[in-house]
Curated annotation (Swiss-Prot):
Its main location: plastid. PROSITE patterns: RIBOSOMAL_L36. It comes from Chlorokybus atmophyticus. PANTHER family: 50S RIBOSOMAL PROTEIN L36, CHLOROPLASTIC (PTHR42888), LARGE RIBOSOMAL SUBUNIT PROTEIN BL36C (PTHR42888:SF1). GO terms for molecular function: structural constituent of ribosome. InterPro entries: Ribosomal_bL36 (IPR000473), Ribosomal_bL36_sp (IPR035977). GO terms for cellular component: chloroplast; ribonucleoprotein complex; ribosome. Disulfide bonds: none annotated. HAMAP family: Ribosomal_bL36 (MF_00251). This is Large ribosomal subunit protein bL36c. Belongs to the bacterial ribosomal protein bL36 family.
Length: 37
């Protein structure tokens, strides 16, 4: 899980979702998991 100020899609499988008021990226590739900090 990468914590970043700006999250963006890295590949086609990446999905932007909002969880508990935070923007997150979920993907089939675990390296692409991100959360806005």
């Amino acid at each position: 899980m990468k914590v970043r100020a700006s999250v963006r899609k890295i590949c086609e499988d990446c999905r932007l979702i909002r969880r508990r008021g935070r923007l997150m990226v979920i993907c089939s590739n675990p390296k692409h998991k991100q959360r806005q900090g």
